[in-house]
């Protein structure tokens, strides 16, 4: 499947990196983003491994990675990552 990040998800990645640099330093922020990239590849390769959450307005799949969650859907032959949010945020409102 093709992995596609929405503009909002790309913005989330930039924000995660900036916040990581501020809190933990650039080297650690880069490592975290590399690990997050591996999780995104997993989601792209095995999207069906993540349970569909149908309790929301629109059913989505939610995959946890450390402090963050990857919110995505399968659309045709694409895995579309809508957002990458911190697990403590009110991400259900978006």
Predicted stretch roles:
Residues 1-31:
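Arg/Lys-rich, positively charged N-terminal/basic patches that mediate binding to nucleic acids
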Residues 34:
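Amphipathic alpha-helical segments that line or abut small-molecule/effector binding pockets
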